[in-house]
């Protein structure tokens, strides 16, 4: 079974950092992590790059230009980019309980 974890985010790099840090603490990891970014700036990109370097699973940054609130569109792009059988979607301001 393969699983994509899709994390939606927009211009809150500190929250995304904490969210990804909680993902890294899990004992059961997804096959891949997709960051569905609704047009965030460089600080968010830097957080994603940091975790790309330390993650035991691939992380891909799915981004589009900020043209207003287009969360559904960026989530759909991330779903289309998934390479897995199953998808779990969470928001980038969640901290996962350790499992």
What do the PLM-derived regions correspond to, one by one?
Residues 65-82:
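Glycine-rich, basic loop-to-helix element that forms the pyrophosphate-binding segment
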Residues 2-4, 32:
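Cell-envelope/extracellular polymer assembly enzymes that use nucleotide-activated donors
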Residues 43, 94-99:
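Acidic donor-binding/catalytic loop of UDP-sugar-dependent glycosyltransferases
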Residues 24-63:
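Acidic donor-binding segment of Leloir-type glycosyltransferases
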Residues 7-9, 37:
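Short beta-strand/turn micro-motifs composed of small residues
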């Amino acid at each position: 079974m393969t699983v994509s974890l899709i994390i939606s985010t927009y211009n809150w790099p500190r929250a995304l950092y904490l969210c990804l840090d909680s993902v890294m603490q899990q004992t059961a990891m997804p096959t891949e992590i997709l960051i569905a970014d609704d047009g965030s700036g460089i600080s968010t990109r830097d957080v994603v790059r940091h975790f790309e370097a330390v993650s035991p699973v691939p992380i891909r940054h799915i981004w589009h230009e900020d043209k207003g609130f287009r969360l559904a569109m960026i989530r759909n792009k991330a779903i289309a980019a998934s390479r897995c059988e199953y998808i779990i979607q969470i928001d980038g301001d969640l901290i996962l309980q350790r499992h």
